[in-house]
Design a protein with these regions (language model features):
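Rossmann-like NAD(P)(H) cofactor-binding subdomain of soluble oxidoreductases
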Residues: 46-88
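NAD(P)+-binding Rossmann beta1-loop-alpha1 motif at the extreme N-terminus of oxidoreductases
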Residues: 1-51
Length: 88
């Protein structure tokens, strides 16, 4: 089973959250997003947790960055993602 954290709350994140939620063997542990309104709505829709606080980032096997191209590098470097986790 893959435990997944989805980072972002835009259109791409919405589509990915729906797909992950329907995928057998995958568990969407958390939506991590700076936009509280969209982040909480996306989390509620998919039955998962939401946070915007890096200290609350869930431990997962896979972290999916569904954010703007401009934000990817800075965000990936600033979040406490475990070294053994996969990031896409």
């Amino acid at each position: 089973m893959k435990n997944i954290v989805l980072i972002g709350s835009g259109n791409l994140a919405e589509a990915l959250a729906r797909a992950i939620s329907r995928t057998e063997g995958a568990t969407l542990l958390q939506i991590f997003a700076r936009n509280a309104k969209r982040g909480t709505a996306l989390a509620l829709e998919n039955g998962t947790a939401w946070s915007s606080d890096p200290r609350e980032l869930a431990a997962a096997d896979l972290y999916i960055l569904a954010v703007s191209d401009a934000a990817i590098t800075t965000l990936a470097e600033s979040l406490p993602i475990p070294a053994e986790a996969a990031v896409v």
